[in-house]
Design a protein with these regions (language model features):
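Short, charge- and proline-biased low-complexity linear segments
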Residues: 27, 52-58
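N-terminal single-pass transmembrane signal-anchor helix
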Residues: 10-36
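N-terminal leader/signal peptides at the extreme start of proteins
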Residues: 1-13
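Conserved alpha-helical elements of the SDR catalytic core
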Residues: 32, 39, 59
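Aliphatic-rich helix starts adjacent to a transmembrane/signal segment
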Residues: 36-54
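Periplasmic/extracellular, small/polar-rich flexible segments of pilin-like filament-forming proteins
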Residues: 57-128
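Conserved amphipathic alpha-helical interaction elements at protein-protein interfaces in regulatory
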Residues: 3-6, 42, 61, 65
Length: 128
């Protein structure tokens, strides 16, 4: 009779029950975390390429008007709504490269940063 009453008055969890819950949460985290981080990296890479494409559009538009490619990144902020888009892979607005080997060709590339892991950015080639 005393054992039954002591079981009824028992409140809380035993150490074994808590350890089992912590173990289960650890296993679930170990399975889910790599997938989550991979998804985050993929979305950052996609955003960096999308921003580079928007920059390429602005570069091409200004080149059509001026008949030459300008490689100064800051010159395109007004064409992009007032500011250069943030490169989520580098965490900066200077994470894009504009190169113009000739006055009639240019390439725009998003820089590879530590926030995205290993990836190959899309190179946007432009020609006047």
């Amino acid at each position: 009779m005393k054992n039954i009453q002591s079981l009824r008055n028992r409140k809380g969890f035993t150490l074994i029950e808590l350890l089992v819950v912590v173990l289960i949460l650890g296993i679930l985290t170990a399975i889910a975390l790599p997938s989550y981080l991979s998804s985050v990296n993929a979305s950052r890479e996609g955003a960096a390429n999308t921003n580079a494409r928007a920059l390429a559009t602005a570069v091409q538009g200004k080149a059509v008007t001026n008949n030459v490619y300008d490689t100064t990144l800051a010159d395109y902020s007004t064409d992009l709504g007032g500011s250069i888009p943030l490169n989520p892979c580098t965490g900066t607005t200077t994470g894009y490269t504009i190169t113009a080997p000739t006055s009639t060709t240019a390439t725009i590339t998003a820089a590879v940063g530590t926030n995205c892991g290993t990836w190959t950015p899309t190179v946007f080639s432009l020609t006047l």
